[in-house]
Design a protein with these regions (language model features):
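Active-site neighborhoods and metal-handling regions in enzymes and metal-associated proteins
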Residues: 1-97
Length: 97
């Protein structure tokens, strides 16, 4: 998960948006609002140890970081479940404006 988190930071930096990238981008989903597994960035905010190992059936929110320009911003998350073939996206919103 740390590799994915680092890749997201690299993309924002490459595109010139690093200063607007707020918060860690990945966290587990379950009974609590944000829960393990938490990669390094998110674990730091929660005072926990990072857990990078992905296991079958884990549900993750990816993209939680938010992009803020001035007073307003947007926060879009994709929810996925880890499968034996990679992942299955379970988010059902449209990606078009």
């Amino acid at each position: 998960m740390t590799k994915l988190e680092n890749l997201m930071h690299e993309i924002f930096e490459k595109e010139g948006y690093e200063e607007y990238f707020v918060g860690p981008p990945i966290h587990g989903v379950g009974l609590e609002f944000e829960e393990p597994p938490l990669p390094a960035g998110h674990a730091f905010f929660h005072g926990e140890e990072p857990k990078d190992e992905l296991k079958l059936g884990m549900v993750l929110s990816i993209g939680n970081c938010g992009l803020y320009l001035g007073e307003f911003g947007v926060r879009v998350e994709d929810t996925v479940v880890v499968t034996d073939k990679g992942y299955e996206e379970i988010t059902a919103y449209s990606r078009t404006l």
